[in-house]
Amino acid sequence: MEFYASLKSIAMHVPSERVKNAEFQQFLDTSDEWIEKRTGIKERRFANDEEKSSDLGVIAAKQAIERAHLTPQDIDLVVVATLSPDFLAMPSTACVLSAKLGIENKPAFDISAACTGFIYLLSVAKAYVESGMYENVLIVGAEKTSSVLDFKDRGTCILFGDGAGACVIGRTKRLKESVLDVQISANGNFSNYLYTPRTLKPTPFNAKEEALEPFLRMKGNEVFKLAVKTLLKDVETILEKNALKPEDVRLFIPHQANFRIIQAVREHLDFKDEQVVLTVHKYGNTSAASIPMAMCEAYEEGRLKKGDLMLLDAFGGGLTWGSALVYFGGI
C-alpha cells in the first residue's frame, strides 16, 4: 500500500438554543433529577424551525475543510450519515450539503446506520481513500433529531439533541497518522427495537392505510442490554485484533447515547477517567454526530493532539454497531 487513510481535520456545530431538563416538566411527567440520574443528560441543543440537518452539517463541513487547508473544490466525495434527513427519500442530504458548499459534479450520498453512522462513514472513507479512488473524502454526521421526536414519549424525547460533526479523510504514508482499523456490523433481526415508522397512504391500487406517526420509537431496556453486551465484545475484539490494550489508547470516545452505557463499557475495560471523552451531559444523544462532536471538543480542549490514538465505538438502530482505532493525523 502506498498510503493510508488519515483523519486530517475535525469540526462541529450545534444550534444556539439550549434546552434544559427542567423544561420538559412543562408537558411531561418528569424532572431534572429523573432525567439526569437515568441518562447523565443535563441539557441538549435544538435547531429552530428553519434549520435542517444540512444547515447544521454545512457549518461544520466548512470549518473541517478549512482546517485541512483545503477548499471545497478539493473534496472528491461527500458522504453524510443521518437519521433525520432534509427530505424523506430524495435528494440525499449529502447532495443538498454539497450544493451549499459549492461542490458540483462530485459524488455524494447518505448512509443510514442511525447512531453508528459515523463509524460507517469512517469505514467507507477508509476504503475509498486506500483504494486510490479518491484523495479527499468529506464525511459528515448531521442530525436534527428533534424533527423525528414524539414529545409525548418520555422514553425518547428527553434523550436526543441536534448537532453536526465533520471530518476530512485524506492520505498519509505514516501508519501512526492513519485510520488504523474499522469494524462494522448489523443484525436486522432486532430492527423493531429502534425505528421510525413510515405512514402509508391509500392509492387506487392499494387501499391499505397505516396512520402511524413518523416519530422515533425505541424499546429502551432491550436496547440498553444489547448495547452494553455488544459493545463490550466489539471493543475487546478490535483491541485484540490490533494487539493493543486499553492503556495503549490515548482517548476512548464512545457514542454519547447514555452515561450508564458508557460507564459500563469503561469500567469493564478499566479505562481511566482521563481517557474517556464525555459530552452527553450537555448535548444529549446527537446520533451520527455524537462521536465527531466529542472528538472535536477533545481537540479544542487540547486533549487530542496529532498522533494520538483514539478508540471509537457506537451502537444504533438497525441494529448496527461498530468500532474504530484512529490516529489523529491532522491540524
Curated annotation (Swiss-Prot):
Free-text comment on this protein's domains from its UniProt entry: The last Arg residue of the ACP-binding site is essential for the weak association between ACP/AcpP and FabH.
Matches recorded under InterPro entries: ACP_syn_III_C, ACP_syn_III_N, FabH, Thiolase-like
GO molecular function: 3-oxoacyl-[acyl-carrier-protein] synthase activity; beta-ketoacyl-acyl-carrier-protein synthase III activity
UniProt KW keywords: Acyltransferase, Cytoplasm, Fatty acid biosynthesis, Fatty acid metabolism, Lipid biosynthesis, Lipid metabolism, Multifunctional enzyme, Transferase
Role summary: Catalyzes the condensation reaction of fatty acid synthesis by the addition to an acyl acceptor of two carbons from malonyl-ACP. Catalyzes the first condensation reaction which initiates fatty acid synthesis and may therefore play a role in governing the total rate of fatty acid production. Possesses both acetoacetyl-ACP synthase and acetyl transacylase activities. Its substrate specificity determines the biosynthesis of branched-chain and/or straight-chain of fatty acids.
Identification of the protein by name: Beta-ketoacyl-[acyl-carrier-protein] synthase III
Catalysed reaction equations from the record: malonyl-[ACP] + acetyl-CoA + H(+) = 3-oxobutanoyl-[ACP] + CO2 + CoA
GO biological process, one term: secondary metabolite biosynthetic process
SUPFAM superfamilies, per database record: Thiolase-like (SSF53901)
Family according to the record: Belongs to the thiolase-like superfamily. FabH family.
EC assignment: 2.3.1.180
Record HAMAP family: FabH
Catalytic class of the enzyme: transferase
Species whose genome carries this gene: Helicobacter pylori (strain J99 / ATCC 700824)
Active site positions, chain numbering: 115, 255, 285
Binding partners and assembly: Homodimer.
Gene Ontology CC: one annotated term: cytoplasm
Pathway(s) the chain acts in: Lipid metabolism; fatty acid biosynthesis
Protein location: Cytoplasm
Residue ranges of coiled coil: none
Predominant location category: cytoplasm
Pfam families, alphabetized: ACP_syn_III (PF08545), ACP_syn_III_C (PF08541)
Designated gene of the protein: fabH
